[in-house]
Amino acid sequence: TQGMREVESLAQIHQRLTASSPHGPIAPLVADVHFQSDVADAAAKVVEKVRINPGNYIDPARKFKQIDYTDEEYQTELERLRNRFVQLLDICKEHKTALRIGVNHGSLSDRIMSRYGDTPEGMVESCMEFLRVAVVEDFKDIVLSIKASNTRVMVTTVRLLVWQMAEENMAFPLHLGVTEAGEGEDGRVKSAVGIGALLADGIGDTIRVSLSEAPEKELP
């Protein structure tokens, strides 16, 4: 979902799906929103679930301009994040919309990169910042994903996220996947290695095998 025009299209699709079923839409709609928090707000009024990326939810894109943040600057940015995110949570509560907080290894914010670098710890903290706000606001309809194209990084990061949530008395469902897995046998093996290792640990609630092929090829 790139902009308001796409949100309008989603509303029309949702209306058609709902009109053909007396018990609500035939299938839930999910909006995957990057770069524009106002689009996430609008989509949350229309669809059943909205995915946001912590790395670009507040700022439109990584700027690579500010490398060092003072503690005061860091806290100011966290407060800005909290204030903006609460607006979305309030909309989701009103419309009974679920959220997916989806962290990507390749799109961590400048602020996270400045303190944690390009690390599993940084990915986990990027997710936890949003979860802490959600917990304070008593919003529980959340699923998490934390993905990387490197399977070792992905597995390490998800395990670390599970540990960190336990440390802070949190428990949210996890969606597993290896991003940019590729195609053919390599893409399938790569996904199987990353997802399978976590499932063997008893970690994970939903999965997606992401392939750079026709969409129907992702179906089991």
Short names for language-model regions:
Residues 1-46:
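N-terminal active-site wall of soluble small-molecule enzyme domains
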Residues 1-17, 54-76, 142-151:
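Glycine-rich, proline-tolerant flexible connector loops at the mouths of alpha/beta enzymes
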